[in-house]
């Protein structure tokens, strides 16, 4: 029975990657909000472009640049090669990597190597295990979580929050009751940092406060503007049933594009941290529609410690341009730092940035 469930999960994961690569599932009429922000130009930067330092620290780990390869895949046959390539890129650029949901690894053993290959290909960078909020709410045990962490020798655990995706998923789990209490139990006992991550609808300051109070060390805002996982699941639903009968036609479009833009998430959490010093140690990851190194730079100036990307890097991997893309993004970031007079990532955090009129 468990192996049958694992097979269903594996098929779903394969379908997710295929849809993200080949169908129009990004937000429509809602962007990240980052284009609404502009850096103040520094005509006298007093910085040597060649000496700009992109390295930084994340959750106690030194990394090469403030970019994370975000949670994408694992748990089915083809994922092994994908995760090996992602791990090799993470190692080469010394950047963190999060694996996709590891639920399948708890349900069966058939594709566990598609996860463990990440550590063998990226032995020295931070790697993060991943499980969903519905599994946490359902009472996933500490031993089960430890199994996932040990499988990839993870430096931390991502708990992904995806209520909108689960709502649209044909076989979705929509019971989130008791989640925060169970999350608190996990953060208190698991022994590694926990990151709370949305999957594309964003995290408000109000929810960020609750998550921090539950013990998470970092928030990945994953705001609106990139992939809409509602649209991904809607594709799967229509492929299976042919027509949509769950939602009113007049409401469907808003639900498919539901979420808080990435920039809005960042600024609201930045305000929370400034007004409440007890949350100052909370790390913030900017994701959800990150397209280039300028988006990374703006994210850092708006309060993020690092940025993360999934779909853009997955597409680059499939086109054979992953390393070229990361290298280009790094140069974008360096250019933004040069033009704002920021020699280090710490200085970039204080660069002058304003909303366009």
Curated annotation (Swiss-Prot):
- SMART domains listed in its UniProt record: IMPDH
User: What Enzyme Commission number(s) does the record list for this chain?
Assistant: 5.3.3.2
Principal location listed in the UniProt entry: cytoplasm
Q: Which family does it belong to?
A: Belongs to the IPP isomerase type 2 family.
NCBIfam families (UniProt xref):
IPP_isom_2
Q: What does this protein do?
A: Involved in the biosynthesis of isoprenoids. Catalyzes the 1,3-allylic rearrangement of the homoallylic substrate isopentenyl (IPP) to its allylic isomer, dimethylallyl diphosphate (DMAPP).
* Entry protein name: Isopentenyl-diphosphate delta-isomerase
Tell me the organism.
Answer: Chlorobaculum tepidum (strain ATCC 49652 / DSM 12025 / NBRC 103806 / TLS)
């Amino acid at each position: 029975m468990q192996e049958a469930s694992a097979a269903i999960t594996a098929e779903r994961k394969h379908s997710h990657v295929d849809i993200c690569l080949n169908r129009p599932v990004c937000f429509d009429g809602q962007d990240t909000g980052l284009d609404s922000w502009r850096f103040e130009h520094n005509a006298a930067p007093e910085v040597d472009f060649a000496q700009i330092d992109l390295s930084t620290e994340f959750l106690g780990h030194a990394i090469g640049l403030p970019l994370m390869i975000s949670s994408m895949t694992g748990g089915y046959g083809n994922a092994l090669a994908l995760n090996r390539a992602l791990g090799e890129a993470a190692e080469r650029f010394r950047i963190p990597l999060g694996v996709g949901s590891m639920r399948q690894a708890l349900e069966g053993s058939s594709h566990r190597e598609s996860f463990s290959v990440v550590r063998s290909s990226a032995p020295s960078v931070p790697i993060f295990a991943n499980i969903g909020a519905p599994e946490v709410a359902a009472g996933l045990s500490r031993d089960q979580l430890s199994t996932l962490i040990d499988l990839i020798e993870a430096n931390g655990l991502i708990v992904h929050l995806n209520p909108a995706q689960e709502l649209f998923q044909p076989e979705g789990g929509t019971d989130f009751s008791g989640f925060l209490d169970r999350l608190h139990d996990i953060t208190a006992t698991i022994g590694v940092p926990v990151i709370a991550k949305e999957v594309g609808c964003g995290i408000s300051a109000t929810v960020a406060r609750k998550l921090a109070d539950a013990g998470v060390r970092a928030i990945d805002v994953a705001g609106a503007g990139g992939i809409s996982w509602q649209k991904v699941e809607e594709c799967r639903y229509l492929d299976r049933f042919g027509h949509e009968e769950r939602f009113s036609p007049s409401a469907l479009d808003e639900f498919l594009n539901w979420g808080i833009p990435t920039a809005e998430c960042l600024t609201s959490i930045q305000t929370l941290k400034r007004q409440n010093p007890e949350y100052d140690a909370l790390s913030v990851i900017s994701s959800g529609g990150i397209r280039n190194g300028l988006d990374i730079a703006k994210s850092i100036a708006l309060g993020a410690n690092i940025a993360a990307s999934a779909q853009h890097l997955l597409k680059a991997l499939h086109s054979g341009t992953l390393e070229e893309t990361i290298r280009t993004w790094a140069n974008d970031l360096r250019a933004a730092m040069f033009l704002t007079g920021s020699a280090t990532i710490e200085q970039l955090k204080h660069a002058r940035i304003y909303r366009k009129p």
